[in-house]
């Protein structure tokens, strides 16, 4: 016969035997006398060596430290001595006389505890049984309403719990209009705040428990602030913003140098975009070197990351720069490319995607330069780039940018809890648009009718570095 099914029974009897058996190994207390529902199966001596061969008996289980088995066999609702204490010195009426009073008709849900005068008839013991202990846990010790658990040391309802917490936290003072002996029950608990608070104290509610709860909340908030600040120290958003601002003057220089040019340049939009991209690739390298920890990576890895992300990095930049432009984009050279020109040049579909999925979304949420810089840093630290010597290191840097950006959003825009997620949702669109733009550039390079300068040509001739 397979004995595995009997392991739980053997284990429980073994645990009970250690508590119930006498030094001679014979059971000094029969299990049926403890609880009739357990049946006669546990009435035999429990010290027989045949029951000690189960492998589970050698394990250190928490149940071995439970002591006598009474807590296991009796009601799980707690110790037998649990009852609602009385405080006659304060003039509060206890449960039973209150139930007997003709002025307080009871509902069916409250008519559970028998009047004290019926103890002899119903054979209610002097000390409450396990069932009575269970009952006291289901009622509020202050007003007799249904208890929601133990609060500040006493089983109480949500109403009395909240009342006591507010009183302690706000350090409120009450006055009784009568003789400081008002009846506090479910129906009248709100009539006298003074007597209700005094009864909370009399029943055992602890002021210090409320204060400790508040301190725990403060400590938790301080820990969160410390964790966010430590993340920001590893990848400070201030440095990321500095990197964005450092390349901005060069963009403005391009704009000033081209102020005399007619915005509708004789060159087609694709040529203008390619020329702007070639110039921006130089500033992109300078930007990347200013991003924290990028220059600490092996030089080969730096090159791989820039080759893998240059197109998305440039698209993110000119999209954010174009927030103030209507139906067009502003290039770093200072030229505007209108959507009509893009459609005429045959790149209208991808141009419209840039406007709707990037420029418009950035405008709607008023994305600032710090957030733009963090998104670009996330693109830069791409652990999926092929050929990296240590992808895990790059992934760790990306995670630090995530943490710093999230902390920045919570601090700068506390009224927008979903802002961090909205920012990250721009990344898939940026990736998709970047790949489509690469397809167009490869096509223009292939047919050869669009002048592509040296740096951009080098980027296009290198194999695409992402998986």
From Swiss-Prot:
The UniProt record gives the binding positions of Zn(2+) 2 as 176, 182, 192, 195
Q: Where does Zn(2+) 1 bind?
A: 140, 143, 157, 160
Where in the numbering of this chain does the NR LBD domain appear? 232-463
Record PTM Phosphoserine, positions in chain: 22, 28, 61, 75, 134, 264-265
- One annotated GO molecular function: protein domain specific binding
Subcellular location, in the record's words?
A: Nucleus; Cytoplasm; Mitochondrion
Name the positions where all-trans-retinoate binds.
Answer: 321, 332
- Region Disordered, annotated ranges: 1-61, 79-109, 211-233
Q: Where is this region: Hinge?
A: 206-229
| Region described as Nuclear localization signal | 165-170
Report where the covalent cross-link Glycyl lysine isopeptide (Lys-Gly) (interchain with G-Cter in SUMO2) sits.
4
Q: Sites of the modification Phosphothreonine?
A: 87
Indicate, by first and last residue, each region the UniProt record lists as having compositional bias (Low complexity).
32-55
Question: What's the domain of life for this entry?
Answer: Eukaryota
Instruction: Name the Gene3D superfamilies on file.
Output: Erythroid Transcription Factor GATA-1, subunit A, Retinoid X Receptor
Binding of 9-cis-retinoate occurs at 321, 332
| Bias kind Basic and acidic residues: ranges | 211-223
Tissue-specific expression: Expressed in the adrenal gland with main expression in the zona fasciculata and medulla (at protein level). Expressed in aortic endothelial cells, with high expression in the descending thoracic aorta and the outer curvature of the aortic arch, where pulsatory shear stress exists, but very low in the inner curvature of the aortic arch, where oscillatory shear stress prevails (at protein level).
Ranges where the record places region Required for nuclear export: 353-373
Q: Where is the composition biased (Polar residues)?
A: 83-109
Annotated NR C4-type zinc fingers sit at 140-160, 176-200
Task: Please provide the record's keywords in A-Z order.
Answer: Acetylation, Cytoplasm, DNA-binding, Isopeptide bond, Metal-binding, Mitochondrion, Nucleus, Phosphoprotein, Receptor, Transcription, Transcription regulation, Ubl conjugation, Zinc, Zinc-finger
Assembly mode: Homodimer. Heterodimer (via C-terminus) with RARA; required for ligand-dependent retinoic acid receptor transcriptional activity; association with RARA is enhanced by pulsatile shear stress. Heterodimer with PPARA (via the leucine-like zipper in the LBD); the interaction is required for PPARA transcriptional activity. Heterodimerizes with PPARG. Heterodimerizes (via NR LBD) with RARB. Heterodimerizes with NR1H4; the heterodimerization enhances the binding affinity for LXXLL motifs from coactivators. Interacts with NCOA3 and NCOA6 coactivators. Interacts with FAM120B.
Let me see what the UniProt entry remarks about domains.
Composed of three domains: a modulating N-terminal or AF1 domain, a DNA-binding domain and a C-terminal ligand-binding or AF2 domain.
Q: State the protein's name.
A: Retinoic acid receptor RXR-alpha
What organism does this protein naturally occur in? Rattus norvegicus (Rat)
